[in-house]
Amino acid sequence: QRLTSLGDDPGGLPHLLFYGPPGAGKKTRVMTLLRQVFGPGAERLRLDKKTFQTPTKRTVEINMISSNYHIEMAPGDAGLNDRFVIQDVIKEMASNKNIANMGSSKDGSGGFFASSSAKNDENEGNKKQKAEYKVVVLCEVDKLTRQAQAALRRTMEKYSSSCRLILICNNPSKVIDPVRSRCLGIRVAAPSHDEVAAVLKTVSRKENITLPDELAINIARASNRNLRRALLMLESCHVTTRDDSPKVLKANTAIPHTDWEKYIAMLAAGIASEQSPKALMAAREKLYELLINCIPAQVILKTLVMELLPKLDDTVKGQVV
């Protein structure tokens, strides 16, 4: 209801900060809001790469998803150069009437979109569009450096008349107060097990897959209330089914887990079984292997703690946490 009221009054739309756990549906709600404000044209998306140049003449390339009315990106992918990316993108959007005129793609088309696509989106959006601004969707804002967040705060003030920012993060405490105070915070809570199971049932019904209620609940629990992960688990169950009827899943169907989760479980078992210099070196090698395969350190440590806790005495659990 809150998002619906914001979409019904596009002229009064403030900067927004969506926060909540992974897989709770933050991005889905953002896209729903954009569609309500700008119409179907906001869902015609294209993926492109944009090149930025830092004051030290270093070139930074960022993947961007765009429509004629908004642009979505994760500035944190630029590392320590994230503040230059934020400043350049918002400044360029504010100076262009249409996002289709921003930058230049590698194929020489002169923008993110072909002109025919831009015209079609404008014609369809005229009936719906009431806003005279563009929207910048910044993902993983809590991973930005302090310098980038300070630059974001200054840019928000300077171009507030022509741009609206929608920020998405998992942990709002890592976003500086000046940025949070300039945004309307919208908390997106993780769905309950029953809600995840209901979504899985809906998806399976649309895909003509028979999903037992027991398996839906098991997937919801195994996903830890992460809806994105639950959908991937459902897909894995369907793909790995070897029966003659792959469209029919059984209640006792095994739920596949990712290789890195199995690897961390092996690491936890090794740590709990033996504490010695040899075991320490083996654990370090496994940690390096996970990091080399681009598993975030925060995810590794959190998963490792959850695997270790059931294997430890109650007197030690507090120290581990």
Where are these regions (language model features)?
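Amphipathic alpha-helical protein-protein interaction segments
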Residues: G23, G76-D82, K130, K134-V137, ...
